[in-house]
C-alpha cells in the first residue's frame, strides 16, 4: 500500500466531510469541493480523521490488490489537497520578464501584451481569482489546487521563457537555464 495512505488525514475545525455514492465532499470556510472516486477505494471517516484504504470487496484476483493500493496514495493526496484548499486556499505567482511585456485586468479578462502584434486576452474562470498587483506580476488563487495550477499553466503557455534571452512568463522562483548564443 502507498505509505502516505497509511497516515490518516486530519480534519481541522470548521470543516465538514461527507462521503456519498463514491463522491467525497468537503465544506469549509473558503468554499465547497467534491471529488468522485473509484469503487476500489474505501473511505472511513472518524470524528476528526479520514482513512483511505483499498476496498477488498472488489478484489477478484491477487493482481487487483496492487491496482487498489496504487490508487490509495493518489486519492489520499487529492482529498488532503481539498481540505487544505477549503481552509487555506492555493496561489501561484507568475512574473513577466521582457521589455514592453505587461498584464492588466479588464473586467473578467486578463489582457497581456507579450510582443505579439495584438494583445492577448484570456477569460478568467469563475472558480479562480486572478490579481495583477503590478504590470509584470500575476497572482492566481483559488480553493482547487488542480484548477489554480492549470490556469497558471495556461497563462504561462502564452509566452514561455526563451532559453536564450530568458524573456517570457515564468513562475516566481522558477530558474530558467539560459543557453549560450552563437559564437562569432
From Swiss-Prot:
Write out the GO MF terms. Answer: rRNA binding; structural constituent of ribosome
One of its GO biological process terms is: cytoplasmic translation
Which is a Pfam family this sequence falls into? Ribosomal_L6
Q: Which UniProt keywords apply?
A: Ribonucleoprotein, Ribosomal protein, RNA-binding, rRNA-binding
Record-level GO cellular component terms: cytosolic large ribosomal subunit
What positions belong to coiled-coil segments? Answer: none
Highest taxon of source: Bacteria
Record's family? Belongs to the universal ribosomal protein uL6 family.
Quaternary data? Part of the 50S ribosomal subunit.
State its role.
This protein binds to the 23S rRNA, and is important in its secondary structure. It is located near the subunit interface in the base of the L7/L12 stalk, and near the tRNA binding site of the peptidyltransferase center.
Query: What name goes with this protein?
Result: Large ribosomal subunit protein uL6
Organism expressing this protein natively? Thermosipho melanesiensis (strain DSM 12029 / CIP 104789 / BI429)
